Amino acid sequence: MREILHIQGGQCGNQIGAKFWEVVCDEHGIDPTGRYTGNSDLQLERVNVYYNEASCGRFVPRAVLMDLEPGTMDSVRTGPYGQIFRPDNFVFGQSGAGNNWAKGHYTEGAELIDSVLDVVRKEAENCDCLQGFQVCHSLGGGTGSGMGTLLISKIREEYPDRMMLTFSVFPSPKVSDTVVEPYNATLSVHQLVENADECMVLDNEALYDICFRTLKLTTPSFGDLNHLISATMSGVTCCLRFPGQLNSDLRKLAVNLIPFPRLHFFMVGFAPLTSRGSQQYRALTVPELTQQMWDAKNMMCAADPRHGRYLTASAMFRGKMSTKEVDEQMINVQNKNSSYFVEWIPNNVKSSVCDIPPRGLSMASTFIGNSTSIQEMFRRVSEQFTAMFRRKAFLHWYTGEGMDEMEFTEAESNMNDLVSEYQQYQDATADEEGEYEDEEQQEADDM
């Protein structure tokens, strides 16, 4: 019931995905061979959100793994939980996308996409009532961005009424892996605006900062970063998998978070984040979780919520706690920081409570915010895009795969439109509406 089909693509997506399955397996008491070794009926009650039960009693993730080169897939397969995935669900090419969006979207990726869709269909047919898809990918490379967005648009055609949730790793402001990141990211956002329902925006630099500043790790690895991401991913769907007093699902989340269809890019946060040594010295309380969760330093993308305003936000608490206290804390946050919330959406923070905390914690919370300050991410990528595109730098790699310059121009203006939409709602006030009506009335009279 209410299954979610997980898809991971490209190197980044596969590495995040692998970590995510470690976390979810741990929560449901499933060992690396797919056997249940847990100690609570609650772990099994709705295990089928993310798992198929095979005939021999093994639990198999509803996961599709794709890449245009075999390398990362091999390391997932040999990793700690590599044996749990269905072998047919690994779909990979040999050529690689070479960090080129066009290769992922139009040439190499297009050749592989049908075999990926076959696996997706097979998994979807195994579902009793498919709720939606969650896609892990990065926007800076070739496969996750190009082929990832191709797959999203194909799934959109075939399953138009199912939720499409993405965990998208944006290029970082200061750390760059590839020169052509701005191109790949802009072309991807162009697709995500149209075809995804909810995008959780992540970026490595913000994750590094959390590891340095809050977790006090001196040399964070991608594994540490991905662990942060997977804690958030597990938090987003915990209400579907464990009983709670205030449930939420992907669709409820969307209804509460998206005031305008194009503005579906969210910043995420997680609490408690404490360094490994100091965990046992703190008692967790709802106020403390709330305070940390709303802290700008805890956001997993390089945009500062204090530079914009929240259109909406959602908080998911996990653990044994009083819902009354949760509600009070949420109202408290809105009252104390009212200037950071748009006043034309009253009560714009939704909260949900799930009774089962993550492993090793007594309580935890996941934060998802729809803030206008996310435009900083798009603005930054857009500036880098324009700088290169003006000189047509690196463009031949894309046109050589059959792309047209026109597509770049469209993607660029779509991204800039998105930025101005966020800006427009950041500046909007509740009483402006009245002024417009007066003007219209005036015009009508003049006519």
Swiss-Prot record:
Belongs to the tubulin family. One of its GO terms (molecular function) is structural constituent of cytoskeleton. Dimer of alpha and beta chains. A typical microtubule is a hollow water-filled tube with an outer diameter of 25 nm and an inner diameter of 15 nM. Alpha-beta heterodimers associate head-to-tail to form protofilaments running lengthwise along the microtubule wall with the beta-tubulin subunit facing the microtubule plus end conferring a structural polarity. Microtubules usually have 13 protofilaments but different protofilament numbers can be found in some organisms and specialized cells. It is found in: Cytoplasm, Cytoskeleton. One of its GO terms (biological process) is microtubule cytoskeleton organization. Tubulin is the major constituent of microtubules, a cylinder consisting of laterally associated linear protofilaments composed of alpha- and beta-tubulin heterodimers. Microtubules grow by the addition of GTP-tubulin dimers to the microtubule end, where a stabilizing cap forms. Below the cap, tubulin dimers are in GDP-bound state, owing to GTPase activity of alpha-tubulin. Its main location: cytoplasm. InterPro entries: Beta-tubulin_BS, Beta_tubulin, Tub_FtsZ_C, Tubulin, Tubulin/FtsZ-like_C, Tubulin/FtsZ_2-layer-sand-dom, Tubulin/FtsZ_GTPase_sf, Tubulin_C. Residues 429-447 have a biased composition (Acidic residues). This is Tubulin beta-4 chain. GO terms for cellular component: cytoplasm; microtubule. Mg(2+) binds at residue 69. Expressed in roots and leaf sheaths. Induction: Down-regulated by abscisic acid (ABA). Residues 423-447 are annotated as: Disordered. Its cofactor is Mg(2+). The gene is TUBB4. Keywords: Cytoplasm, Cytoskeleton, GTP-binding, Magnesium, Metal-binding, Microtubule, Nucleotide-binding. GTP binds at residues 11, 69, 138, 142-144, 204, 226.
